[in-house]
């Protein structure tokens, strides 16, 4: 009694045979909605007018009587290109929020805020330069390294703490100001 084993070498040399199927699936789609079937049997000119109304899906105007639409379309064709009604909106006006005194106060506040932000930008640049100097001091000669460690290192940490605290305070202040403005509107 001999046991026959099929050699897998034909499959291993040609792996594209593993997933190859010769059966082609065929699908048939049938409509089960009687309303769609009745629409296709109706007059094609009537369905063209109702679909070209341009109103949109599910709007009451699209489901209104097609006879009115048909008569309006034919009467419009008889008149030709007549005058059409144009509805114009009023131009958008800028609201007047504050008086001259309020405008001067807002301008002064804007200038103060710009000065503060420029100062804060300068402090950030100083912190960046201090950090680069401290990072590079290990590669410099011993005398410069001692000089930077003596003068720059003690100033670096407090300046970073000041920058973070000031930035946080500025953010909270601006948030409170925005909330007040929203409350006034």
Curated annotation (Swiss-Prot):
Residue ranges, compositional bias (Basic and acidic residues): 83-92
UniProt subcellular location: Plastid, Chloroplast membrane
Low complexity composition bias: residue spans: 47-75
Lineage top rank: taxon: Eukaryota
Transit peptide: 1-46
Membrane topology annotation: Multi-pass membrane protein
Transmembrane segments: 115-135, 152-172
UniProt keyword annotation of Zinc present: no
Cellular-component GO terms for this entry: chloroplast; chloroplast membrane; chloroplast thylakoid; plastid
Alphabetical keyword list: Chloroplast, Membrane, Plastid, Transit peptide, Transmembrane, Transmembrane helix
Region (Disordered): 35-105
Name assigned to this protein: Protein LPA2
Gene: LPA2
């Amino acid at each position: 009694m001999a046991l026959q084993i099929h050699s897998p070498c034909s499959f291993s040399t040609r792996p594209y045979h593993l997933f190859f199927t010769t059966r082609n699936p065929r699908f048939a789609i049938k409509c089960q909605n009687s309303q769609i079937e009745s629409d296709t049997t109706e007059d094609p000119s009537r369905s063209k007018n109702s679909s070209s109304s341009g109103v949109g899906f599910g709007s009451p105007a699209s489901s209104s009587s097609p006879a009115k639409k048909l008569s309006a379309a034919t009467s419009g064709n008889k008149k030709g290109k007549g005058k059409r009604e144009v509805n114009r909106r009023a131009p958008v006006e800028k609201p007047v929020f504050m008086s001259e005194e309020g405008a001067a106060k807002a301008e002064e506040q804007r200038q103060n805020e710009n000065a503060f932000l420029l100062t804060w930008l300068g402090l950030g640049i100083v912190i960046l330069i201090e950090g680069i100097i401290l990072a590079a001091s290990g590669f410099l000669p011993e005398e410069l390294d001692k000089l930077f460690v003596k003068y720059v290192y003690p100033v670096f940490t407090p300046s970073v703490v000041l920058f973070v605290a000031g930035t946080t305070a500025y953010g909270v202040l601006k948030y409170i100001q925005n909330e007040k403005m929203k409350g006034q509107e």
